[in-house]
Design a protein with these regions (language model features):
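Channel- or pocket-lining gating/hinge segments that regulate access to a cavity or pore
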Residues: 157-286
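Soluble non-transmembrane domains of integral membrane proteins
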Residues: 1-160
Length: 287
């Protein structure tokens, strides 16, 4: 993946060309969602053979950057459906591409993934499935062609690749630091005490608590900004709720420590004084 909405794909596309096809048609294909520049798209005819019965076989090697909308709201438990749309070279000719299933060697194409190198590096994803289907595409124009019938519910061939994200990487990069921060917060909260000997032994003071909370908040904000930059075009993703909860936990520890030290009277002061701030410490994890 180049970024959250652009992925790189390379491969070979072939066509078997029957001699019975109209002479007005030419072999070739179009990837309508490709980003076509000198650096992002390559297409080269690498073989051309004549098969039995006069049928022609053409094969192209291609490299392309494809732009496609992706849903990241369930990150890191999300999955991706990459759709490689394929059109005939004369897309206005009302021709429909048909998958060449006979050229795949796997016996059960419904159960097995096909059409993709098993050694491919998927950058944090696992291959779940591949299959062909048709997209019923509609347009509000005939593009100037009087006999064009592809404007309404016209089938376009799509090669689909389903990817499942590897949760382990996301856990180590994003969730594990949050867990460490929460443990440090809880450890900081355990130092809140009214016992003079414990306060002296643990060097407890409200300034230390506020400084610790500020440092942990800064660490989380940096990680959160890096995550948001990664999914800048996406609405809030699932893992971001853990950051929001962590911000709340930081405020909770700082506010509790200040109130415990300064508000020794009243209902809140009495609740916090019970068993040396036991209620607030117990409520930390549910928060």
């Amino acid at each position: 993946f180049e970024n959250p909405v652009v992925f790189n794909v390379t491969g070979i596309i072939w066509q078997k060309w029957s001699p019975d096809l109209p002479a007005s048609l030419e072999p070739g294909f179009v990837l309508p969602e490709k980003i076509e520049t000198a650096d992002t798209y390559t297409e080269e005819l690498i073989y051309e053979e004549t098969l039995d019965g006069g049928e022609k076989l053409y094969g192209w090697y291609f490299e392309a950057h494809i732009r496609q909308s992706m849903d990241y709201t369930e990150f890191p438990f999300d999955h991706k459906k990459i759709e490689l749309r394929l059109l005939p070279k004369q897309w206005q000719s009302n021709a429909v591409l048909i998958p060449d299933f006979d050229s795949y060697l796997k016996k059960d194409l419904l159960a097995d993934s096909f059409g993709i190198d098993e050694r491919i590096i998927l950058d944090g994803y696992d291959l779940a499935d591949t299959y062909f289907d048709y997209l019923r595409q509609s347009y509000d124009t005939n593009f100037g062609f009087p006999n064009y019938v592809g404007a309404e519910e016209f089938p376009e061939l799509i090669f689909n690749i389903h990817l499942q994200r590897s949760v382990e990487n996301a856990f180590i990069i994003y969730l594990f630091p949050i867990i460490i921060v929460l443990l440090l917060l809880f450890g900081t909260m355990l130092t809140v005490t009214s016992d003079a000997q414990k306060r002296e032994r643990m060097d407890f003071n409200i300034s230390m608590i506020i400084a610790s909370c500020s440092a942990l908040f800064f660490i989380l904000v940096l990680a959160h900004v890096e995550l948001r930059d990664r999914f800048i075009t996406s609405p809030i993703v699932y893992i971001e709720y853990f950051y929001l909860l962590s911000y709340g936990a930081i405020f909770y520890v700082a506010a509790n420590s200040y109130i415990f030290c300064e508000a020794r009277s009243g209902m809140i002061g009495k609740l916090l004084a019970f068993e040396d701030n036991l209620l607030a410490k117990t409520a930390f994890w549910p928060s």
